[in-house]
């Protein structure tokens, strides 16, 4: 049998020995057909994002946060805080804008979560530094425009109206507003997407399943971001110490309705935030049910309600609204007056009523007054002062703690847990609260399994650097409190406040003397003037002794040839201060005035 020659032998790995037991020769793959070994690619560096809180940490108010990534910056909120009781003469406190002014060319816009003063109150002062576009929901923009009108800035500012679920492109940032419940309509959280990842800043929020309007908080969108991956969550800590859930706004309507029933045959005066459109609408609806007319008092109340009606957020039946001047034309049981002053503001309408200085309204025994808001921390004394004043005038006053009229606009612990569970953040930064509230919120996050190494309690001025690999702190930036006193912004500092505190406690003694510019000899005086220290006519011996002490101090300066006037003033001040303290155990401010001739 003829043998067939194998012309194309199979590859060695697929061949076996033939029947003869001989192995076939191996064939080598040509060199050029070998696959080159791929060089190992270096791991791509994680893109960082910087978060600079300029306000709102360790305090309730003055909220302002700056984000920076890839050379672009955006700002979220720009609020104020009301002054503490020891900030004499200060009208408000705003953030220090030094850092944002230094980086103004990088800033792509200012995003606002909602229209409360602690989130929008400082905007006019920022716009006086430089122009930038403002992004906010319809009502929020309306409230800001009202504020800017007072500063002549409304026509110069660019507003961009935002809508929940519609994304905004700002440099390298893509921002999506997310609807949340709060005590004011049109409140949003922000999902801030950048090359570093997605950060969610909640703004002020609560989870109300039966809100008055606008629908519940958008838990679906928050959950979707949680499924995609959230780099960090910055969440409202105001009620971090309160267990359970925040009560629904529906509860307020029931509470106020019961108070209306108690106020039969009386005039009703209700104080609330001018920006709390929900609450004002509830009051209007109840007044209509009760057959009462409604009037507004307080500039911000009048302006905000007019704007809310114009934008369709408030509905007042025709014939219901009257002016404050018309109140006395109706019987007390037929009117409701909605006013500002729920926080004890000295110049508010309710404060002027309590001090009998309101031009149109006189409070008396026929009035039923409801303060429909809890005092912001630090305002308790001011509110108490107003309550006492109203009670002394004979009015019946309902305030926080007596009935469940105020309902918080902030999430309690269970709502905070739900926010953390839905968003599943890698890193967590509690914001918007005093340190004890931030700390408690951090503990809540840790109880849900977030590693403590991924939780950071920052401070105003911190430089928080986030990436997919780590969270760390960089060099801090300039941050602080700038005090506004009348038209002065930043010209009142700690030294001025210390002097004002000193004056308020112990008063002032002024020393006036005329001296020879060459010899230092006293030519006239010294004369002593007391303001807030003692009444001179009733303390003549004290003041005579003080005058002798000053004369002796000036004579010693002449004898010792002291010619430096600052040194002379210091000696006089020290001598008189020591004498007054020995006699009275008080330390008034002493101001020597030496006039050279």
What are the functions of these language-model segments?
Residues 1-45:
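Intrinsically disordered, low-complexity RNA-associated tracts
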Residues 242-372, 376-545, 549-561, 569, ...:
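Hard-cation-handling environments
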Residues 148, 445, 580:
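Conserved hydrophobic residues forming the short capping helix/wall of the S-adenosyl-L-methionine
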Residues 28-111, 116-330, 348-362, 381-385:
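His/Asp/Glu-rich metal-coordinating catalytic cores
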Residues 57, 81-91, 95, 106-107, ...:
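A glycine- and charged-residue-rich anion-binding loop/surface
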Residues 163, 459, 586-590:
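Short Gly/Ser/Thr- and Asp/Glu-enriched loop/turn motifs at secondary-structure junctions
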Residues 561-597:
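C-terminal tails and terminal domains of large nucleic-acid-associated
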Residues 133, 429, 591:
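Short glycine-rich phosphate-binding loop at a beta-alpha junction
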């Amino acid at each position: 049998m003829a043998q067939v020659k194998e012309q194309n032998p199979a590859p060695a790995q697929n061949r076996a020995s033939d029947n003869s037991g001989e192995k076939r020769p191996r064939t080598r793959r040509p060199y050029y057909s070998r696959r080159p070994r791929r060089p190992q690619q270096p791991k791509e560096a994680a893109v960082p994002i910087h978060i600079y809180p300029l306000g709102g940490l360790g305090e309730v108010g003055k909220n302002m946060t700056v984000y920076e990534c890839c050379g672009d910056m955006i700002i979220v909120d720009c609020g104020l805080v009301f002054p503490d009781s020891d900030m004499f003469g200060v009208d408000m406190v705003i953030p220090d804008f030094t850092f944002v002014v230094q980086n103004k060319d990088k800033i792509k816009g200012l995003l606002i979560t909602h229209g409360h003063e602690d989130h929008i109150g400082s905007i006019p002062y920022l716009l006086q530094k430089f122009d930038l576009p403002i992004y906010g929901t319809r009502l929020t923009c309306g409230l800001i425009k009202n504020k800017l009108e007072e500063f002549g800035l409304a026509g110069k500012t660019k507003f961009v109206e935002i809508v929940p679920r519609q994304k905004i492109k700002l440099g390298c940032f893509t921002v999506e507003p997310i609807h949340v419940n709060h005590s004011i309509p049109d409140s949003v959280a922000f999902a801030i997407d950048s090359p570093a990842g997605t950060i969610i800043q909640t703004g002020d929020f609560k989870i109300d399943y039966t809100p008055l309007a606008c629908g519940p908080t958008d838990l679906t969108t928050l959950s979707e971001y949680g499924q995609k991956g959230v780099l960090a969550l910055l969440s409202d800590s105001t009620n971090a110490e309160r267990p359970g859930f925040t009560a629904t706004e529906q509860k307020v309507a029931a509470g106020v309705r019961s108070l209306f029933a108690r106020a039969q045959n009386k005039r009703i005066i209700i104080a609330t935030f001018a920006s709390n459109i929900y609450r004002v609408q509830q009051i209007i609806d109840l007044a209509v049910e009760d057959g009462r007319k409604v009037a507004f008092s307080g500039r911000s109340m009048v302006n905000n309600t007019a704007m809310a009606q114009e934008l369709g957020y408030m509905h007042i039946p025709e014939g219901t609204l009257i002016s404050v001047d018309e109140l006395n034309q109706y019987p007390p049981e037929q009117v409701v007056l909605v006013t500002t002053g729920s926080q004890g503001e000295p110049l508010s309408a309710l404060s002027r009523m309590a001090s009998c200085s309101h031009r149109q309204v006189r409070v008396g025994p026929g009035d039923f007054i409801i303060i429909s808001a809890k005092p912001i921390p630090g305002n308790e004394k001011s509110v108490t002062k107003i309550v006492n004043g109203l009670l002394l005038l004979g009015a019946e006053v309902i305030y926080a703690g007596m009935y469940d009229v105020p309902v918080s606009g902030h999430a309690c612990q269970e709502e905070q847990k739900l926010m953390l569970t839905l968003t599943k953040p890698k890193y967590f930064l509690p914001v918007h609260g005093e340190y004890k509230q931030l700390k408690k919120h951090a503990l809540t996050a840790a109880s849900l399994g977030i590693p403590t190494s991924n939780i950071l309690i920052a401070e105003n001025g911190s430089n928080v650097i986030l990436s997919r690999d780590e969270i760390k702190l960089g060099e801090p930036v300039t941050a602080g409190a700038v005090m506004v006193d009348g038209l002065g912004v930043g010209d009142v500092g700690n030294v001025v406040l210390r002097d004002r505190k000193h004056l308020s406690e112990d008063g002032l003694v002024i020393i006036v003397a005329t001296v020879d510019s060459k010899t230092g000899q006293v030519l006239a005086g010294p004369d002593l003037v007391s303001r807030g220290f003692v009444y001179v006519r009733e303390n003549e011996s004290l003041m005579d002794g003080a005058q002798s002490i000053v004369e002796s101090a000036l004579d010693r300066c002449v004898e010792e040839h002291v010619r430096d006037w600052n040194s002379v003033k210091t000696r006089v001040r020290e001598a008189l201060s020591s004498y007054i303290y020995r006699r009275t155990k008080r330390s008034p401010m002493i101001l020597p005035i030496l006039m050279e001739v």
